[in-house]
Each structure stands twice: as C-alpha cells, then as structure tokens.
Amino acid sequence: MRSRRLLVAVGLVASMLLAAVPVAQASNGRASFIVVLDDSVDAPRGVAAEHSQAFGADVTYVYRNALKGYSARIDEAQLGGLRADKRVAYIERDQDVTIDQTTENAASWGLDRIDQRNGLDNSFSYTNTGAGVTAYVIDTGIRTTHGEFGGRAVSGFDAVDGGAADDCHGHGTHVAGTIGGSTYGVAKGVTLVPVRVLDCNGSGSWSGVIAGIDWVTGDHQPGAPAVANMSLGGGASTAVDTAVKNAIADGVTFAVAAGNSSADACRFSPARVPEALTVGATTQTDAKASYSNYGKCLDLFAPGSSITSAWNTSDSDTNTISGTSMATPHVAGVAALLLQGAPTRSPAQVASDLASGATKGAVSDLGRKSAGTPNLLLYTIY
C-alpha cells in the first residue's frame, strides 16, 4: 500500500558549496601524496612500510579494498625514487575538500516533487521504505541519536580522528535525513551508516575520502543491497575516480554530487565517474539551480535548493540548505527504495532504471552552456 505523508515546512539557514584546493605544502618540502599501487600488489600495507623506511614516507592511510595504495607525507625529492618502483602505478598530490556556507530562508519541498510528474501537492507517496538496504553516507558523520533516524543510524567509520563518526558540522546529518529520515527522508526504513571523512569545519582531503570509500568497499557484504552518497567533490583525481569505480564494481550504487560551480561536471571528481549516478540540482520551479554543474557527465537532476532536513545541533533540530549536496541524497534514497523491491539489481541496472524512469524535459533554464546535459528529473514509483 502506498503511504502518503504531509511535508513539513521549516524556514531556516544555510547553503553549502563544496570546493577542493591543494593540500598546503610544509616548509621542509614535504607534502601529502596519494600513492596508487598496481592491482597485482597483494599487501599494500607491506609496501607502504617498505616505502616509509626507504623514502621517509609518513603514511597516513593504507588502502586495500577500493584500490591498492596508501597516502603519506613525502619529501618531493623522493618522488622520483618512488615512481621507479614498478609496483607504483601512479602518484597524485593530495587535495583538501572544504565547505563554504551562506544563508537563506526557505522551506522543504523535495519529497513532494519526486513522486509525481508535474507540480507539487504537499504530500509524498511511497510503497517501499528501503528496509533491508544499507546507505553509506560519506560526509561529516551523522548525529545517530537524532529523532529522524529512529535507531536506524548505526556505527560506521571515522577517517578524521578514528572516533565514532559523530557529526560536529551538520552537513552529513542533513544528507542522511534526506536519504532516510522519518519525516524528511525518501527511504524511511533504510539503515544509515556514517562514513566521516570531513571534520567539524567541513574540511578533509582526498586521501581521507579514499579511506572512507575503501572502508565502504570492505564493509559491504557480497550481494547485499547498498547505496553510497557522496555529497562532496573537488578537482579531478584519478585515484578518487578509481576508488569509486571499484566500490561500484563491488556492488554498491553510488550517488555523487555534480558540484556547485556552475561549470561542466566532467571537470570534477567523483562527478565525472561514468559508473556513478551524478546528480544536478533544481529549484522549486523545476529550473536548473544557478549554482549547479551541468554537462554530459550528469545522469539526472533532483531537488536541491532550499531543502529542509535533520541537523546535528540537537536530536530534533532541522536546517534548510541548498546545493547539489542536497539533490544527491534524494537519488540515493530512491535507489534504496528500488533495491528493497529488487535487491539483486546491479549498480548499472539501478542507474539505468532511475534514468529511464525519470521525468523527461521537465528541467528549465539549462542554457546554451548546458548543451548535452540530460534533461531528466528524478521520479519515484517505488
């Protein structure tokens, strides 16, 4: 039976835009790098230890699941020696990921929009709840005690400080609330797992993000229905793209933000990963949000402007914010609804199902720069 739930309007705060900048280089010539090893390497931890001794690499993370490799602070003078090791596939300079915040007043409407082809009717209809599906939230953590989650938010992984993946920023709790909150969520029965890769200031690094993806890949059980949400992004990174691709190959459907630069999404990671569901943002009038990235790397759009969801400051607080960060969890939630009813669908099949079922031609204000952008708006019948 399809349930109907009235939407709650809350007029509050903040829009978030994500960007990436190079990690600062230390004055002694050392900087943070991601060292990706050949797939044939069986023991990346051993190679990392060997490189630490031979080249003075100060290892921060070791990757075993989503890719083989490690991150470390390394003297740039040692990079030539590292690259000469035939077990090294390539080396990337690490990048920081940060969140910029502005304010606005608005109310939530996203759930109302995705369950019908046209307009709004102040309700959200659904059959499935996402029960039995795991949703990994790769973000700032989750306030797992929030009333929106009803005990469905469980312990996860913390790449920032090895803690409990608690959210001291708010962004991750908001994203989780849109995926699976009891009031504001698409999939109201999904299990939510925090994967904390951004700190209390909303800052992190690609090396930490890869550590989170690596943990997700290792935690995911073969054949188990699962989705992952990445409402973050930054400059192009082959290592990040590879980690996401390998996690998808393991059976986890990834929804990733297109980005908030009003630019071609193909310039950014992980938005440019073809196997992922790359999501742009729309406004309440079905216009492309002015900040949303665009282009052929997008798969579809979803509501992203003025979205109300859970917040981290108490077990009942909410916040209203904007961005492709807010559009992406709508897609992750619908993917979870689909997987409840069809748990053996592969990530490629889920992506195809969501694209083919989307409302066609509904998004306006794409503009000439958006040539090649698929005009598809998220729709759920699940």
Residue ranges and their predicted role:
Residues 26-29, 123-155, 163-208, 221-227, ...:
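Subtilisin-like serine protease catalytic core
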Residues 39-42, 66-67, 77-79, 95-99, ...:
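Solvent-exposed loop/turn segments at secondary-structure junctions
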Residues 103-106, 121, 125-128, 162, ...:
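Active-site-adjacent substrate-recognition loops and nearby beta-strands
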Residues 60-61, 194, 212-232, 237-243, ...:
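C-terminal subdomain of the subtilisin-like protease fold in secreted/lumenal serine endopeptidases
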Residues 1-26:
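Secretory targeting and sorting signals
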Residues 26, 49-62, 84-134, 147-148, ...:
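Protease zymogen maturation seam
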Residues 22-104, 226, 345-347:
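Inhibitory N-terminal propeptides of secreted protease zymogens
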Residues 33-36, 71, 90-92, 134-138, ...:
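Structural recognition of the beta-strand scaffold that forms the well-ordered cores
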